[in-house]
Amino acid sequence: MSIKEWPEDERPREKLLRQGPATLSDAELLAIFLRTGVNGLSAVDLSRQLLQQFGSLRALLGADQGAFCHAHGLGPAKYAQLQAVLEMGKRHLAEQLQRGDALTSPQLTRDYLQAQLREVFALLLLDNQHRVIQFVELFYGTLDSASVWPREIVQIALKHNAAAVILAHNHPSGVAEPSRADRQITDRILAALALIDIRVLDHLVIGDGITVSFAERGWL
């Protein structure tokens, strides 16, 4: 049965317009994006199949072009459409902050960084009002003491005349709990930036839907 044959109050698009996007399941949201299903599968059924195949909505949205296009019911056109939607979301968040909004909310910071991060150690540079100056992706791959150089972070902070920074990196495993190496590297960066009077406001470790804040744990 196609979605058009469903009762109106069960159709994803009508449900979104009536109740808002937060009320929809991942499969229903994805179905609105896909618009149509394939032979034998409605858009919602196809969405459920894709979510099961990729493991989660996050994994599907973060899939590379090859993996995405190889999936049944997807292809280059859908991949291009998805990348455009994701980029618009990133730019919307960036514009909210870069218009001068202060980073006073930990959740706002997390939303901004979660939209940016792809297995990377990043630096958010802030002015003395905690407004965003620049978002810089620094190091890629596994975070360890050999890959992160406090001196380089100091140079970048000075170059942009930052008054404060927020550090962030994600754990590809999806587990957000900081490792001993995470804490040791943070301490080194904290000490290096303290010498030039630049504050580290937070270090965010981002996992699969969970973010750990060093500041909230009292580690800074």
Curated annotation (Swiss-Prot):
Gene Ontology molecular function, alphabetical:
metal ion binding; metallopeptidase activity
Q: Which Gene3D superfamilies match?
A: Cytidine Deaminase, domain 2
Tell me the residue numbers annotated for binding Zn(2+).
169, 171, 182
Record PROSITE patterns: MPN, UPF0758
This protein's record includes keyword Kinase: no
**Can you list the disulfide-bonded cysteine pairs?**
none
Report domain MPN positions: 95-220
Provide the leader sequence positions: none
Protein's GO biological process: proteolysis
Query: Which keywords does this Swiss-Prot/TrEMBL entry list?
Result: Hydrolase, Metal-binding, Metalloprotease, Protease, Zinc
Residue spans crossing the bilayer? none
Pfam families registered for this protein in UniProt: RadC, UPF0758_N
Q: Does the keyword Amino-acid biosynthesis apply?
A: no
Q: What positions does the record give for the motif labelled JAMM motif?
A: 169-182
Family, per the entry? Belongs to the UPF0758 family.
Give the protein name, as stated in the record: UPF0758 protein ASA_4229
Species this protein is from: Aeromonas salmonicida (strain A449)
